[in-house]
Amino acid sequence: MRIGQGVDVHAFGDGDKIVIGGVVIPYERGLVAHSDGDVLLHALCDALLGAAALGDIGKHFPDTDSAYKNACSRTLLRMVYSKLKAKGYSLVNADMTIVAQAPKMAPHISDMRAKIAEDLDTHIDNINVKATTTEQLGFNGRKEGITALATVLIK
């Protein structure tokens, strides 16, 4: 058994929607990113890579590589999981937290869990996503960006 953790942060910028956990959420702003800016899946990728001692998302999908410009993070997640499976690992469970003052995540969490479970070829009960705010404190509280944290157990 091996544990991995991941963290990602993206600032808000131009746009009218965000992608979190593979779910498109209408919002008054977008997220600044080289790919689709899915902070939750980026944190999850880092957690998986870390658990398998495979580095981090920046090593595998550098933001200097135009091949990953506007990349779908669900595709990146599936690629990461393929690397783990090639080393003989499989997911036991994943627990993730989204830190955002806005938009509200609760209406979208069940869809996020389903998409992540599909991408990791696991039962939805092995995937947990929760959301919290910072009670208007810090950059998340000022609605300047979104943070995501992920912890995984692999075997």
UniProtKB/Swiss-Prot annotation:
Its cofactor is a divalent metal cation. SUPFAM superfamilies: IpsF-like. It is an enzyme of class 4 (lyase). GO terms for molecular function: 2-C-methyl-D-erythritol 2,4-cyclodiphosphate synthase activity; metal ion binding. Binds 1 divalent metal cation per subunit. One of its GO terms (biological process) is isopentenyl diphosphate biosynthetic process, methylerythritol 4-phosphate pathway. The record marks H34, T133 as: Transition state stabilizer. Homotrimer. PANTHER family: 2-C-METHYL-D-ERYTHRITOL 2,4-CYCLODIPHOSPHATE SYNTHASE, CHLOROPLASTIC. Belongs to the IspF family. Involved in the biosynthesis of isopentenyl diphosphate (IPP) and dimethylallyl diphosphate (DMAPP), two major building blocks of isoprenoid compounds. Catalyzes the conversion of 4-diphosphocytidyl-2-C-methyl-D-erythritol 2-phosphate (CDP-ME2P) to 2-C-methyl-D-erythritol 2,4-cyclodiphosphate (ME-CPP) with a corresponding release of cytidine 5-monophosphate (CMP). This is 2-C-methyl-D-erythritol 2,4-cyclodiphosphate synthase. The lineage of its organism: Bacteria, Pseudomonadati, Pseudomonadota, Gammaproteobacteria, Cellvibrionales. The gene is ispF.
